[in-house]
Design a protein with these regions (language model features):
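Hydrophobic/aromatic-rich alpha-helical bundle segments in the mid-to-C-terminal region
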Residues: 116-120, 137-191
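Helix-loop "lid/cap" segments that line or gate small-molecule binding pockets
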Residues: 87-93, 100-112, 183
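Residues in soluble alpha-helical coiled-coils and helical-bundle/repeat scaffolds
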Residues: 39, 50-54, 76-79, 93, ...
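Amphipathic alpha-helical packing segments from all-alpha helical-bundle domains
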Residues: 68, 73, 94-103, 113-139, ...
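Short, basic, alpha-helical segments at the C-terminal edge of helix-turn-helix-like DNA-binding modules
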Residues: 61-66
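N-terminal intrinsically disordered/low-complexity leader segments
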Residues: 1-8, 191
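Hydrophobic alpha-helical connector segments
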Residues: 58, 69-99, 147-154
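Helix-turn-helix
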Residues: 9-12, 16-54, 58
Length: 191
């Protein structure tokens, strides 16, 4: 199947916006800068995306789709949960570009209700991935916490770690992750 006309230009703009979001942040992005980075005409940003904000939303959505697919495959793997947990925690280091994009758009959404609604949908997609991953584990390990509460705990824990790491703060992270791993290991052994 052939790509639709303009697909390569559109992808180049998305790639450029992704790089700029990571390197310069949302405040450093202009239509002209994205177009220049993509080797394209700045009018194409508006043609394909309507606005710079919509371009940034598409960057987030494209990145999110890739990572959610990866997470679902990882959580669906036939390996002990502790191995899946370790892999997920390694992703905290590997996914810093996505994390920066996520927090850049979160900060933009504080004053843009339409963007806030979209980010709430993305948040819901991530929560669904965690619900699917943790429901059988919670029951098997006898974790007496409502599933919604467990997922919220894990999600906000991850966001806190990500935000601190983006700020250059890693104090206590290694120790906390080791403690959680030991706790999970003890739960696994007790089953």
């Amino acid at each position: 199947m052939l790509a639709r006309p303009g697909y390569a230009s559109e992808q180049a703009l998305l790639d450029a916006a992704e790089r700029l979001l990571v390197e310069a942040g949302a405040a450093g992005i202009t239509t002209r800068r994205v177009a220049e980075e993509a080797g394209s005409n700045h009018g194409l940003v508006h043609y394909y995306f309507g606005s710079i904000e919509q371009l940034l939303v598409r960057v987030l959505d494209r990145f999110t789709e890739r990572l959610i697919e990866r997470q679902r495959q990882m959580y669906g793997a036939d390996v002990p949960f502790l191995e899946r947990w370790r892999t997920a925690m390694c992703y905290l280091d590997e996914d810093r570009a996505y994390q920066k994009i996520w927090f850049e758009l979160q900060s933009l959404s504080w004053n843009r209700p339409e963007l806030r609604e979209h980010l709430a949908q993305v948040h819901g997609d991530w929560q669904q991935v965690l619900m699917e991953a943790f429901a059988p584990v919670r029951d098997r390990l006898g974790i007496e916490m409502p599933l919604d509460a467990l997922v919220t705990l894990v999600y906000t824990f991850n966001e806190g770690v990500m935000l601190e790491r983006l700020c250059g703060i890693e104090t206590g992270h290694h120790e906390l992750l080791e403690w959680i791993e030991r706790w999970l290991q003890q739960r696994e052994e007790a089953v």
